[in-house]
């Protein structure tokens, strides 16, 4: 207000408060990722695609903007015979080469090396349901601040899974291996 950017006096009221919530940065274990991969989703094409796109994120540890657009132009074989995904990350412009593990190869084969078009909000919606169906329901303590006081409550892990969980899970599991 002092800078003349607005003239809203409500911000000075005692009733005005900032509500914050801590982000719970979970990751999925290899066994939880396998449980998601092993689900039979053949009766729901949209869930099947969302699951597969999410798994590509787990197997590559890339951002959604990078892993959701992988196509045959990104896939090549090194002189050693190793199949890799070769891409330039959209956010940073970094060039990365990612080894293709058998689980990732199966998904690439399923879609003839071109993942179906997917949208982050759709994958986020379905992946929570898919994680629940896979039995990923461990209780996680989530903390938040309300009226200046830190509070906690329990949430099922499946409800915290989102597209970025794939990247975090891939990176964490590679580190732990």
What are these regions (language model features)?
Residues 36, 41, 82-83, 173:
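Catalytic cores of nucleotide-enabled group-transfer and carboxylate-activating enzymes in metabolic
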Residues 5-64, 119-122, 167:
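Basic, Lys/Arg- and aromatic-enriched nucleic-acid-binding interface segment
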Residues 2, 59-60, 176-177:
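Alpha-helix C-terminal capping/termination sites
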Residues 43-44, 113-117, 128-177:
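Short, basic (Lys/Arg/His-rich) helix/loop patches that form interaction surfaces
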Residues 15, 69-107:
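Conserved tyrosine-mediated DNA breakage-rejoining catalytic core shared by Y-recombinases
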Residues 1-11, 63-65, 128-131, 135-137:
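N-terminal DNA-binding recognition helix of tyrosine site-specific recombinases/integrases
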Residues 34, 61, 65-69, 98, ...:
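Feature representing long, continuous alpha-helical segments
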Residues 24, 41-46, 86-95, 111-119, ...:
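Short, contiguous acidic/charged loop-to-helix segments that flank catalytic cores in large enzymes
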């Amino acid at each position: 207000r002092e800078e003349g950017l607005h003239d809203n006096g409500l911000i000075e009221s005692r009733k005005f408060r900032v509500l914050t919530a801590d982000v719970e940065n979970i990751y999925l274990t290899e066994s939880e990722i396998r449980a998601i991969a092993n689900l039979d989703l053949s009766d729901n094409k949209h869930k099947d695609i969302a699951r597969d796109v999410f798994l590509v994120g787990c197997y590559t540890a890339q951002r959604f903007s990078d892993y959701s657009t992988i196509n045959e132009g990104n896939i090549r074989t090194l002189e050693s015979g190793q199949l890799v995904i070769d891409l330039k990350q959209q956010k940073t412009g970094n060039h990365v080469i990612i080894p293709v593990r058998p689980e990732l190869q199966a998904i690439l084969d399923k879609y003839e090396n071109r993942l179906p078009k997917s949208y982050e909000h759709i994958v986020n919606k379905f992946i929570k349901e898919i994680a629940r169906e896979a039995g990923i329901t461990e209780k996680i303590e989530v903390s938040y601040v309300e009226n200046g006081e830190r509070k906690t409550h329990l949430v099922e892990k499946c409800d915290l899974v989102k597209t970025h969980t794939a990247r975090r899970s891939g990176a964490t599991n590679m580190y732990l291996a």
